[in-house]
Curated annotation (Swiss-Prot):
Residues 224-275 are annotated as: Disordered. The gene is rplB. This is Large ribosomal subunit protein uL2. InterPro entries: NA-bd_OB-fold, Rib_uL2_dom2, Ribosomal_uL2, Ribosomal_uL2_bac/org-type, Ribosomal_uL2_C, Ribosomal_uL2_CS, Ribosomal_uL2_dom3, Ribosomal_uL2_RNA-bd_dom. The lineage of its organism: Bacteria, Pseudomonadati, Pseudomonadota, Betaproteobacteria, Burkholderiales. One of the primary rRNA binding proteins. Required for association of the 30S and 50S subunits to form the 70S ribosome, for tRNA binding and peptide bond formation. It has been suggested to have peptidyltransferase activity; this is somewhat controversial. Makes several contacts with the 16S rRNA in the 70S ribosome. PANTHER family: LARGE RIBOSOMAL SUBUNIT PROTEIN UL2M, RIBOSOMAL PROTEIN L2. Keywords: Ribonucleoprotein, Ribosomal protein, RNA-binding, rRNA-binding. It comes from the Bacteria. Part of the 50S ribosomal subunit. Forms a bridge to the 30S subunit in the 70S ribosome. One of its GO terms (biological process) is cytoplasmic translation.
């Protein structure tokens, strides 16, 4: 995997940096693990915009990812590493000894031909999935469950990883990349190692059109709107907002706490620090 700076043959390519991975499979994805994915353009069933800046983009299929990894004791072999347009991480197509194929998140250093295993008897090896109670303290993990059997929810993005800090009774403490420390049940499953494609954060899109291919529409600043459209709008000439930054609906938009899930607050040992 390498970072390639594109020659400035046009304004859109000036400054563009691509992530090139020669090991990615160049054919079509495995048809048995594809599902239809329809566009919403950010609208709900009434046609009202519920999420701004979404629309257009290339047609995509959803790749069904196995986030539960419950085929215990059956060895699997990595057939190929693929690009997935639905996430920043790459995915791996694995073939189990019983003939079933599944997509999983590709770990750092994973290559075609690697042997993987799920379950409590699996060795501590990058790409293997097992309960946290069987993973040594200090191990870097990803695809961590928050509830036993629910499937991986934490550390699924490119380059992500959490560190197993301690085990106490039926719970373990894991440190997330944000610095937050959470309690997780020891029966929750996690995959050993970091998520691959960490260079994804170093790429530079280069032009607005590349974001339109991804289905992202422009974001217009509130200060250039009219007062009817945004609280920051209006004024003669170029003027400041005249107030603390707010959303188009008047809610504070920088730094306001939005978390309201009190049910799981007890699972947070320490909140993330300010950057």
């Amino acid at each position: 995997m390498a970072l390639v700076k594109v020659k400035p043959t046009s304004p859109g390519r000036r400054g563009m940096v691509k992530v090139v991975n020669a090991d990615l499979y160049k054919g079509r994805p495995f048809a048995g693990l594809l599902e239809k994915k329809s566009k919403t353009a950010g609208r709900n069933n009434n046609g009202h915009i519920t999420t701004r800046h979404i629309g257009g983009g290339h047609k995509q299929h959803y790749r069904v990812i196995d986030f539960k990894r419950t085929k215990d004791g059956i060895p699997a072999k990595v057939e190929r590493i693929e690009y997935d347009p639905n996430r920043t991480a790459n995915i791996a197509l694995v073939l189990y000894a019983d003939g079933e194929r599944q997509y999983i998140i590709a770990t750092k250093g994973m290559a075609v031909g690697d042997q993987l295993m799920n379950g409590s008897e699996a060795p501590i090896k990058s790409g293997n999935c097992l309960p946290i109670r069987n993973i040594p303290v200090g191990t870097v993990m990803h695809c961590v469950e928050m509830l036993p059997g629910k499937g991986a929810q934490m550390a699924r993005t490119a380059g992500a990883g959490v560190v197993l800090m301690a085990r106490e009774g039926t719970y373990a403490q894991v440190r997330l990349r944000s610095g937050e420390v959470r309690r997780v049940h020891i029966e929750c499953r996690a995959t050993v190692g970091e998520v691959g494609n960490a260079e994804h954060s170093l790429r530079k899109i280069g032009k607005a059109g590349a974001m339109r291919w991804r289905g992202v529409r422009p974001t217009v600043r509130g200060v250039v709107m009219n007062p009817v459209d945004h609280p920051h709008g209006g004024g003669e000439g170029k003027t400041a907002a005249g107030r603390h930054p707010v959303s188009p609906w008047g809610q504070q938009t920088k730094g306001k706490k939005t978390r309201s899930n009190k049910r799981t607050t007890s699972m947070i040992v320490s909140r993330r620090g300010k950057k």
